Amino acid sequence: MSDFTAQTTTEPREYDAGFGDYFALLKPRVMSLVVFTALVGILVAPGGVSPMIGFTAILFIALGAGASGALNMWYDADIDAVMKRTAKRPVPAGKVPAGEALTLGLWLSAISVAMLGLATNWVAAGLLAFTIFFYAVVYSMWLKRATPWNIVIGGAAGSFPPMIGWAAVTGDVSLASVLMFGIIFMWTPPHFWALALFLKKDYNNAGVPMLTVTHGRTETRRQILIYTILLVPVALGLVLTEVAGPVYLITALVCNAIFLKGAYDIWKRDEAMAEADGYAVEKKVFKFSLLYLFLHFGALLLDAIWRLI
C-alpha cells in the first residue's frame, strides 16, 4: 500500500472519476451478497420488524459493507494494480485518488454504524462496527499479506451480515444466527481456494500468500475437500432451529451433495489433468459455490414465507 500511495502523492495525476467509479469502490457485487443475507436474517428473526425499520437496517448494513470495500481498495491498491482480476478497480486504474477512497470509507463507516444504532439497536451497530474493523484492519492490513490462512480467519468479516440483520430485529444473538454465520464462514475457504487454483500466478505476482502459493495446489485441493466436509454439518444443523423448514432441508441436502461431489472431483485431480482442460472443474465448482449461498439463504426466505401462509 505504501509504494502505491507514495506514487500517487509524488506524481500529479489527472483523475476522471464518475459516479460509477465511486460506486465501484463499494464493491457492489460483494454488497449484493451482504444485503441478501442480512435481509434474510431480518426476515427470519422472531418478532418481526416494521418495513421502514427493516429497509433502514438494510440500507445502513449495505453502507457499512460499502465502507469496508472502499477501505480495502484504498489499502490494497498496490496489490490490485498487479492482479489482472483487480487492475481495473477505480484506485489502481487511476480513476479515484487513494485519499478519496480512504475518506469515503471512513465517513461511510461512521455514518452506517451510528445510524444503524439509532434506527435499530446498539447490538446490531456494534456487530457492524466490528465487521468493518475486522475486514478493513485485521484482514486487509494484516492477515491477507501475512498468512496463507488469511481467508479462513478473515472469512469471519463476510459472515456477520445475517447475524447483524437478526440482531437488528431481536437485539441479541441466537443459535440460528450463529449457524447462519457459520455457513458463510465455512463456505468461504473452499470458495476462494477454488478461485485461487486457477489464479495462482496472479496471487504469486502480487505477493499474496494464498494457500496455492505457499503450500501448492495439491494441498489446496485437499483443504478444499476438508472444509467442504466441515461445511455440511453446519449447513444441515440449521434444520434443528426454528428458522429452517422443508424447503431449506431439501435445498441443503441437494446443494451440499453437489458441493461435496465438486470438492471431491477437485481433490482427485492432478495438475496435468487441470491444465489439460483449463481448470474446467475448478471453475465449475467456483461458479456453483456462488450459487450455493444464495440457494441456502433463499430457501430460508421461502420457509419464512411458507410459515406466514
UniProtKB/Swiss-Prot annotation:
Alphabetized GO MF terms: protoheme IX farnesyltransferase activity
Membrane topology type: Multi-pass membrane protein
UniProt subunit comment: Interacts with CtaA.
Homology family: Belongs to the UbiA prenyltransferase family. Protoheme IX farnesyltransferase subfamily.
Annotated protein name in UniProt: Protoheme IX farnesyltransferase
Top-rank taxon, per record: Bacteria
Main localisation: membrane
Catalytic activity: heme b + (2E,6E)-farnesyl diphosphate + H2O = Fe(II)-heme o + diphosphate
Transmembrane residue ranges: 30-49, 53-75, 98-118, 123-143, 151-171, 178-198, 224-244, 247-267, 285-305
Extra information: Carbon 2 of the heme B porphyrin ring is defined according to the Fischer nomenclature.
Biological pathway: Porphyrin-containing compound metabolism; heme O biosynthesis; heme O from protoheme: step 1/1
